[in-house]
Amino acid sequence: MANIFTAGPARALFFYGQQLIGVGKTLSETVFDSSITGEEVRGGPGNLLYGKYFHDPNLNIQITDAMFNLQYVAASLGVDVNQGGVSLYESAKAGETVGASGKITLTETAVAFDGAILAWYKKPADDDWTVATVSENAITIPSAKTGDHYCVKYFYQNMNAKSITIKAQYVPKTLHLVLINDLYSGDVANVAASTSKYGRLITDIPQYQLDGSQNLSWSATSAATVSLNGSALAIDDGTSCEEDPIYGTMTQEIFGAKWQDDVKAVAIGNADIDLAKSASETLQVYAVFGGGVASRMMDNSNFNFTVESGGTSASVNESGVVTATTTAGTAVISVTLKDAAGEATDKIGYANVTVAN
């Protein structure tokens, strides 16, 4: 296997149910932290170590995005984003013009603030603001003259905005998280490839429980970042008859790679077959990868099947179905991998077929 390395923050996909609520392309940090507690099993003279019992496995992930996203904050607080929200109207540079009787008609419909519908005004040159009660969506300024200009502020409902409710007690959302990290070549003989993407590492966490912490820090010398830290929750993937919960999966994808090139040998699960005359059986062919990679039964369309000897007793078709003839005897079937690098004989398996009298 070629030497590879991974560097840089991941890209992230955040799903809530089937809805894609965010794509993290500007993450500044992604930390994948798995841990487990091991208890030593000791006993006997000298209190020897006989084994370890492992418990409390954790998979924690830290994610920091350099860009602000209200959806991320909402997910941390366990709420949904709503269309529309309370906004603050602030006069433009020219201010608002006073009409007859010292009245200024508000551009937007003011809403209540602390139980009353209020607005605040001042002349551009003044420092202090004066509060006024809004009546019929207008304010009256005593002693103001028609044509005077005032700065005005008030709250109104802006349907073009988006808002969230910050609850006093909340449960952070559980998302489906997918992290995508770039892989690069680490081979000395392949320096050019080390500067470009060689592949990618895809981490899939179906149940990602956010920890609910959010620290938006604004300062004069930095931008506020959004965090989406959390932990993986165990799920039963349903692929086994036994309860075998998982936290997720991690997939290494090398661009241009073929699984056939990683096969070290071909093995046949039913390599010794006993058949009655005219009976048939399908070969079960496994690709042996080696290097700690589990062998896997592959579809027979990936292999070539040939009768090497005993053709009078058995035949095999392109789908790997062995059929006995009416002649008793033995036959040898060879199985070779298609589209594999090297000689065909490098990756070959055999099945022995016995046809009963």
Can you describe what each PLM-predicted range is?
Residues A132, R296-M298, N304-G320:
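Low-complexity "stalk/linker" and mucin-like segments enriched in Ser/Thr/Pro/Ala/Gly
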Residues K153, Y286, S334-T336:
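Extracellular recognition modules
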Residues L70-A132, Y156-T195, G291-G292, D299:
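Extended beta-strand solenoid/passenger and fiber regions
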Residues A257-Q284, V288-G290, E343-N357:
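Short S/T/G/P-enriched beta-strand
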Residues A328-A341:
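A short beta-strand micro-motif common to beta-rich folds, especially ectodomain repeats
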Residues M1-L77, D128-W129, G199-S227:
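Solvent-exposed edge beta-strands and adjacent loop segments
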Residues P142-A144, L201-D262:
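Mixed-charge, glycine-accented linear interaction segment located at domain edges/termini
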Residues I139-K145, N317-G329:
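Extracellular/luminal low-complexity segments enriched in Ser/Thr/Pro
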